[in-house]
């Protein structure tokens, strides 16, 4: 297969990358894949030097009559060449079994003769028997491919690959702490005040109930004595079949209740005393208004002063006014 030079390039069209047995054998006339004129340094082709026919479908057989079919993308073979009776589907360069990685088998021992019966398949088998594997990972392999890799031909010097991990297919069912939602942590973090989350709430104790006889004896003792000494409290607890802590707690609660009742009673008595005092003051004021003022001797002889002394604007009694006028006229 002849090599296309740069003068065959058309603007706007990518050059079809040729592929043949000569390039695999590093033929000097075609300038092998690793030659100085190869496209290894060309960044536009990427894997073109390793897989020359990775992006174009291969044509017919080689000019040397090897009988190997041209390989297209991912090892798709073309029709057999004129040298071999049966063209094989696979070429000398084949893709690896792992999806996402590429294995290029390069034949280093040479192809079959023009009359070989293997064709392209024979060249591929010979290439696999004496070729090295160049692995070019493109992306992460799928879980199914890693779990079930296809076996390669025996006797090949291969690069150590990733070993099969048991249970890789179940990776989707695995959960990790960092995958879990943070909502429950957020809920626990923002519920209530910070100091409420530090200590768990205390469990409430059931209320202690006493018998009627015990309560009556405690009330009698409390009316006689508001405070008990330690010995007295212990004797009372023993007599009532109670613990010392129960008697102590009951007296503390009873004193608190007694103080509250005493304060309420004092407040009620004070309000009642103030109410009685206001009532007495009002009655005294009403009596003072009802009693007549003693007549002044000076005012008795002066009618104007007498009228001014007996003037009561708040009084509606007209009889007083008439009496004042009669007294004044009598004095005159």
UniProtKB/Swiss-Prot annotation:
Pfam families: Homeodomain. One of its GO terms (cellular component) is nucleus. The modification N6-acetyllysine is found at residue 238. Expressed in various embryonic tissues, including branchial arches, some component of the nervous system and spleen. GO terms for biological process: animal organ formation; cell fate commitment; cell population proliferation; central nervous system development; lymph node development; neuron differentiation; positive regulation of stem cell proliferation; positive regulation of transcription by RNA polymerase II. Residues 203-262 bind DNA. Keywords: Acetylation, Developmental protein, DNA-binding, Homeobox, Nucleus. SUPFAM superfamilies: Homeodomain-like (SSF46689). It is found in: Nucleus. GO terms for molecular function: DNA binding; DNA-binding transcription factor activity, RNA polymerase II-specific. It comes from the Eukaryota. Controls the genesis of the spleen. Binds to the DNA sequence 5'-GGCGGTAAGTGG-3'. This is T-cell leukemia homeobox protein 1. The gene is Tlx1.
């Amino acid at each position: 297969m002849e090599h296309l030079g740069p003068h065959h390039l058309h603007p706007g069209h990518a050059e079809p990358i040729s592929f043949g047995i000569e390039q695999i054998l590093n033929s000097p006339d075609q300038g092998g894949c690793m030659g100085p004129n190869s496209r290894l340094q060309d960044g536009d082709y990427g894997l073109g030097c390793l897989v020359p026919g990775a992006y174009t479908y291969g044509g017919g057989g080689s000019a040397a009559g090897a009988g190997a079919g041209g390989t297209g993308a991912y090892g798709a073979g073309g029709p057999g060449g004129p040298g071999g009776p049966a063209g094989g589907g696979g070429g000398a360069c084949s893709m690896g079994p792992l999806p996402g990685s590429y294995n290029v088998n390069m034949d280093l021992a040479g192809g079959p003769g023009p009359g070989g019966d293997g064709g392209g398949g024979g060249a591929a088998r010979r290439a696999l028997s004496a070729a090295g594997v160049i692995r070019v990972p493109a992306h992460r392999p799928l879980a199914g491919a890693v779990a079930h890799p296809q076996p390669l031909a025996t006797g090949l010097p291969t690069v150590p690959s990733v070993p099969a991990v048991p249970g890789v297919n179940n990776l989707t069912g695995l959960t990790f702490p960092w995958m879990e939602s943070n909502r429950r942590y957020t809920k626990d973090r923002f519920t209530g005040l910070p100091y409420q989350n530090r200590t768990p709430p205390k469990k409430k104790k059931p209320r202690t109930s006493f018998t009627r006889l015990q309560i009556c004896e405690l009330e009698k003792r409390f009316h006689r004595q508001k405070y008990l000494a330690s010995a007295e409290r212990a004797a009372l607890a023993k007599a009532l079949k109670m613990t010392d802590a129960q008697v102590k707690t009951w007296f503390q609660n009873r004193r608190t209740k007694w103080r509250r009742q005493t304060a309420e009673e004092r407040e009620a008595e004070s309000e009642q005393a103030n109410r009685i005092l206001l009532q007495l003051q009002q009655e005294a004021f009403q009596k003072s208004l009802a009693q007549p003022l003693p007549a002044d001797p000076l005012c008795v002889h002066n009618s104007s002063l007498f009228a001014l002394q007996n003037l009561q604007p708040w009084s509606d009694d007209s009889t007083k006014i008439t009496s004042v006028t009669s007294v004044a006229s009598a004095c005159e």
